[in-house]
From Swiss-Prot:
It catalyses: [GlcNAc-(1->4)-Mur2Ac(oyl-L-Ala-gamma-D-Glu-L-Lys-D-Ala-D-Ala)](n)-di-trans,octa-cis-undecaprenyl diphosphate + beta-D-GlcNAc-(1->4)-Mur2Ac(oyl-L-Ala-gamma-D-Glu-L-Lys-D-Ala-D-Ala)-di-trans,octa-cis-undecaprenyl diphosphate = [GlcNAc-(1->4)-Mur2Ac(oyl-L-Ala-gamma-D-Glu-L-Lys-D-Ala-D-Ala)](n+1)-di-trans,octa-cis-undecaprenyl diphosphate + di-trans,octa-cis-undecaprenyl diphosphate + H(+). This is Probable peptidoglycan glycosyltransferase FtsW. Peptidoglycan polymerase that is essential for cell division. The gene is ftsW. It comes from Neisseria gonorrhoeae (strain NCCP11945). GO terms for biological process: cell wall organization; FtsZ-dependent cytokinesis; peptidoglycan biosynthetic process; regulation of cell shape.
């Protein structure tokens, strides 16, 4: 068994045996549940994601393009509707926020067009290290020369505009992990051979490595075996630390979920996935409890009506806006909440304004649109995987996770299902950096689909 003996002669590892035995039994139950979930998931996977890609003869995914165009246009319309009162009150120009957002949309469309025509996916793959390094440097720069707004330093001032590096980092992480897993996928899959006992043994070694030489040696051996995965993930973790310093807990959660999700798609075994998810959740709980304002948000989320004029003000007014919408809404422009009652109506809480003006029906249509985008992204990713375009597959799936988790969190906050956090609704909320890089990600989906279709027709795309 190879016990580790502490300096005082006590055999430490024996203390972990009862715990490990219980953990093994619990793990067996989890694995049985996971087998059922995999079978169900395979059925849903086949039903939703399998689709012919050349049956219509088109060279690109026209439905995806039109969905992005329509959602972006609707987002501009709702930004104007939600911000007209605020803009008129602040400076008298009721088109102020609409004009700024439209400028970023136009810039995003132009940049997307140029990149679509000029950069094949193999070019993107060569640029990944530079993009990731640039995003990391900008995360450092924002802490040095950033502009503080509402107590957070998240923006770099560029004249009259503000640039948010975190939005670039979200896309950079997807590209970086896609490149990493394409090259090192076998390392993750090799972890399947390690049992639960190895996990607990590795955990014990890590805990005791500071004081026990043998535990330190075994920890270093484990690190050397999986260094090709551990070191890059540590770089992503360092970026997450910089984001928490800003602080931006919402983006931290989104990027963490993207990373965990892509690890799972890359073949991380179920047992490690459960351990990783548990560790992440535990870490998030610690970060929430460490910041009084986050604790206050959680308390307000649990019972917003206890303090409707204080900590629960934003959430209660969001819920009232949604309630006023009823089935079919009050009509475009007829929202009452945007008239100074609901803070951030054109940014984080634009979904509540949409619900107020278009009702439950409008909410369902918008949620369907986001669900359609997520399924489309995973469908394109599956096609790339089937065609042997692994790098493309990871990018498409990562973008699907990004859209899905960020829209889920934003909508969840608006309807009172999640604590308040500062996240935009993709393609809808006011935010230049957000919409710019979301349009770039949509361009990547279209480019990946285009290369899928070319390969299906016999062209070489690598």
């Amino acid at each position: 068994m190879g016990c580790i003996v502490c300096s005082d002669g006590i055999v430490c590892r024996l203390k972990f045996l009862p715990f490990a035995a219980g953990a093994n039994r619990l793990a067996g139950g989890f694995l049985k549940i996971s087998e059922v979930l995999v079978k169900v998931g395979d059925g849903v996977h086949t039903l939703l994601l399998d689709r012919p890609i050349v049956r219509d003869g088109r060279k690109f995914d026209a439905p995806l393009l039109w969905m992005v165009v329509l959602m972006t246009a609707f987002g501009l319309l709702m930004i104007y509707s939600a911000s007209v009162y605020l803009a008129s009150k602040e400076g008298g120009d009721q088109f102020f926020y609409l004009t700024r957002q439209a400028g970023f949309v136009v810039a995003g469309l132009i940049a997307s067009g140029f990149l679509w025509f000029l950069c094949r996916m193999r070019t993107w793959r060569r640029l990944v290290p530079w993009i990731f390094a640039l995003s990391g440097l900008l995360l450092v720069a924002v802490l040095i020369a950033g502009r503080e707004i509402n107590g957070a330093t998240r923006w770099i001032p560029l004249g009259p505009l503000n640039f948010q590096p975190t939005e670039l980092f979200k896309l950079a992480v997807i590209l970086y992990l896609a490149s990493l897993f394409t090259r090192r996928e076998e390392v993750l899959r090799s972890m399947e051979s390690l049992g639960w006992q190895s996990i607990w043994r590795g955990t014990a070694n890590l805990i005791m490595s500071a004081t026990n030489p043998q535990a330190r040696r075994e920890t270093l051996e484990m690190y050397g075996r999986f260094r090709a995965i551990i070191l890059p993930i540590m770089l992503v973790a360092f970026g997450l630390v910089l984001i928490m310093v800003q602080p931006d807990f919402g983006s931290f959660v989104v990027i963490t979920v993207i990373t965990v999700g892509m690890l799972f798609l890359a073949g991380l075994p179920w047992k490690y996935f459960f351990v990783l998810v548990g560790s992440v959740l535990g870490g998030m709980v610690l970060m929430i409890t460490a910041a009084p304002y986050r604790v206050q948000r959680v308390v307000a989320f649990l019972d917003p009506w206890k303090d409707p004029q204080g900590a629960g003000y934003q959430l209660t007014h969001s819920l009232m806006a949604i309630g006023r919408g009823e089935w079919f809404g009050m009509g475009l422009g007829a929202s009452l909440s945007k008239r100074g009652f609901l803070p951030e109506a054109h940014t984080d809480f634009i979904f509540a304004i949409i619900a107020e003006e278009f009702g439950f029906f409008g909410m369902c249509v918008l949620i369907f649109c986001y669900g359609w985008l997520v399924v489309r992204a995973f469908s394109i990713g599956k096609q790339s995987r089937d065609l042997g375009l692994t790098f493309n597959a990871y990018i498409a799936s990562g973008i699907g996770i990004w859209i899905g988790i960020q829209s889920f969190f934003n909508i969840g906050v608006n309807i009172g299902a999640l604590p308040t956090k500062g996240l935009t609704l993709p393609l809808m909320s006011y935010g230049g950096s957000s919409v710019f890089f979301m349009l770039i990600s949509m361009m990547l989906l279209l480019r990946i689909d285009y290369e899928n279709r070319r390969k299906m027709r016999g062209y070489r795309v690598e």
